[in-house]
Amino acid sequence: MRNLIRSVEFDEFYSSLPLNVQNKVQYAMNIISEIRVVNTKLVKKLVDTDFYELRISVGNEYRVILFTIDHENFIEAQEILLLNGFIKKSTKDYKKEIEKAKQILNTLSDENKD
């Protein structure tokens, strides 16, 4: 079973979602925490990054940027950090959201050094 760690930014995104979308996100989180090998329709590696995306479709395309803490490979990882989420409108959204995820990760890393 995986341990999912939620960032403040993820929690802010999650709480802003309509209840039906929150339910779907929670369902997806349950799947990735309990099932080791997850279909790429749900979790996919983001090209040229250290991140993965959790893919949720409820009318709109919702994405959550994930980071595997203890292993580079999602399947092997036991600690997953949920960094931030967004509504995907175009592929251009990814660059901005990946930069935001990097900033969150750097901030969390700096906090853990103290």
Identify what each model region corresponds to.
Residues 1-62, 72-79, 87-114:
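Basic, Lys/Arg-enriched alpha-helical interface segments
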Residues 83:
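Conserved catalytic cores of phosphodiester-cleaving nucleases, focusing on short active-site segments
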